[in-house]
């Protein structure tokens, strides 16, 4: 269609109100007016091949169908979300070990009881250290 046949541009017809359906004029329906509306008092033939434009309201999908999903799609989305969450979580394994530190304040080996029993008994001078082993990645807050 030639640009000369399209009426209703800002230069040709400034009185056309927005929101109204404007018709494109073909050479077979030349009129004196630059633009016209479908609400004329004259009876016009309605034909599918005519100059009228289809309404935009029927061209898009219904809103209700855009929210409908198949069960398989929902399952796939949940699986992807779980994988992302798992990779973002801190993967830390903590192993706690007690290390026995036998502290003898007596440098001399005075064995008051020499009955052949060489077991270490808790004399109150022993201390224990706790050792933590971290395995995996530790994510610091605020850096992601």
Swiss-Prot record:
Written domain comment of the UniProt record: Domains SOFL-A and SOFL-B are required for function in cytokinin-mediated development.
Membrane association type: Peripheral membrane protein
A Gene Ontology BP annotation from the UniProt entry: cytokinin biosynthetic process
Domain of life, source organism: Eukaryota
Keyword flag Nucleus: yes
Record lineage: Eukaryota, Viridiplantae, Streptophyta, Embryophyta, Tracheophyta
UniProt keyword list: Cell membrane, Cytokinin biosynthesis, Cytokinin signaling pathway, Cytoplasm, Membrane, Nucleus
Organism from which the protein derives: Arabidopsis thaliana (Mouse-ear cress)
Protein name: Protein SUPPRESSOR OF PHYTOCHROME B 5
GO annotation, cellular component aspect: cytoplasm; nucleus; plasma membrane
Subcellular location: Cytoplasm; Cell membrane; Nucleus
Position of sequence motif SOFL-B: 52-61
Chain intervals for the UniProt region annotation (Disordered): 27-130
Residue runs in coiled coils: none
Motif SOFL-A, residue numbers: 18-23
Tissue: Expressed in vegetative tissues (hydathodes and trichomes of leaves, shoot meristems and roots) as well as in floral tissues (pistil tips, developing anthers and sepal vasculature) with higher levels in young and developing tissues than in mature ones. Expressed in seedlings, leaves, flowers and siliques, but not in roots.
Loss of function: phenotype: No obvious phenotypes.
Bias type Acidic residues, positions: 35-54, 106-117
Function of the molecule: Involved in cytokinin-mediated development. Promotes the expression of cytokinin synthases (e.g. IPT3 and IPT7), thus triggering the accumulation of trans-zeatin riboside, trans-zeatin riboside monophosphate and isopentenyladenine 9-glucoside.
Family classification: Belongs to the SOFL plant protein family.
């Amino acid at each position: 269609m030639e640009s000369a046949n399209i009426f209703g541009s800002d230069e040709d017809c400034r009185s056309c109100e927005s929101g109204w359906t404007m018709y494109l004029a073909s050479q077979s329906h030349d009129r004196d007016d630059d633009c016209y509306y479908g609400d004329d008092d004259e009876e016009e033939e309605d034909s599918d091949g005519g100059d009228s434009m289809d309404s935009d309201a029927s061209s898009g999908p219904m809103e209700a169908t855009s929210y409908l999903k198949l069960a398989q799609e929902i399952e796939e989305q949940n699986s992807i979300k779980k994988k992302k969450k798992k990779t973002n979580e801190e993967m830390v394994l903590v192993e706690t070990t007690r290390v026995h530190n036998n502290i003898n304040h007596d440098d001399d080996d005075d064995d008051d009881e020499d009955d052949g029993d060489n077991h270490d008994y808790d004399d109150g001078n022993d201390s224990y250290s706790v050792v933590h082993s971290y395995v995996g990645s530790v994510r610091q807050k605020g850096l992601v």
